[in-house]
Structure formats: structure tokens, C-alpha cells
Amino acid sequence: MRLIKHDLSYIDAIMAGTSRPEIHDILGMDTHMIDREGTTRFVLNMIDDNDCTQYSRYILDDDDQFIGIITLKDIDRVDRIATMGTWIYPERWGEGYNRRAKDEMLTTAFTQLALEAVLFGVKLRNIRSMKAQEKLPYTTLDVADRYPERALTKQIRLNEPFQLNVVYKEDFLEYLRVTLNS
């Protein structure tokens, strides 16, 4: 598995994923966001942003096939915090790619981008993602009260019940230290 920068050659692969209801419904994507024009606009925005306010990568499987996208968004370099979102082709769920992609992206967030915390907002109806986040040993669950402004922003964006979770730098780096030493 590896993460690579956005480029226009993966437009069809992205559309194949985001056109699926189990992806675009959970992500709250309108039809204009998942057609060719909307997908191209998204990729060009990621390229133009040049990792300033968003750090987004394609997820390639062990055979270098596109299987999803992972993004650090709303990067706040003053408060050293961002929000992470990810999606993977449904037929690749349960194969460990989401965890591997998150681990790699969190490593980048904490060691290269100097962030101190990464938030995950998960819709309560997204049981699969809720359970996946509960399994992550470095995640602190249900922290909306610690980040009221960010929780309000997320609530407005999602317009439905959600849970705000966080990964703190020290927790993740300790997880890596223990994992690498075992």
C-alpha cells in the first residue's frame, strides 16, 4: 500500500468509487460533485492547494491499483490541528487498507506537518466507520466538548448527528514506538 499525490490520470477510478451510494451518501456528495466535471475540479483543487490547507493522497493497494482517497483537511498550522477523512472502495473494506492508510497519514501529520491533533468526525449512522475508529488504539472517542467550535462547524457541514474523535500526537507516536518494538 502506498499514498500518492493527486493527478488527473485517476479521474475515472475516483468516479467509480464516488458514484457508489455507500460512498457518496456517507460523504454527503451531491451529484454535481461526482460527475466528471466535479471530480476534475476536486483533483485540480487538491493539486492547486499544494498541501497548504489540505493534504490529500490517493490510496493505492499492494498492486498499485487505486482504491480510495485519504485527506487531512482544514489544516490549522497555528493551532496545529486538522480533520481527517477517508474513503475506500467497498469491495476492499476489511482488508486493512484503511488502517494502513490512516497510520501512514497520521505519521505524516505528526512528524512532517508538525500537527498535535487530528480529528475524525463520523456520522452516527455510519456504523462501519464508528466501529473502525473504536478499534484504533490511539483514538480518543467523543471529544466534541473539547473542541466546541470545530464540532459546531462539523455539525453545520454534516447536518446530522455525528461523533467527534481525535488522535493526539503523543498517543499515536507511543503506539508506533510500541508497535515497532514488538
Can you annotate each of these PLM segments?
Residues D25-L27, S56, Y175:
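Short, hydrophobic secondary-structure boundary micro-motifs
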Residues T18, L27, M46-N50:
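Hydrophobic residues in alpha-helical segments
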Residues M1-D12, A16-E22, L60-S182:
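Acyl-donor (CoA/ACP) binding surface of acyl/acetyltransferases
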Residues H24-L44:
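Conserved GNAT-fold acetyl-CoA-binding loop/helix
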Residues L44-Y58:
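A short helix-loop-beta-strand connector motif used in the catalytic cores of GNAT acetyltransferases and
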Residues D30-T31, Y55, G121, E149:
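Sparse recognition of residues in long alpha-helices and their boundaries
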Residues E22-I23, H32, D48, Y138:
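Residue-level marker of structural boundaries
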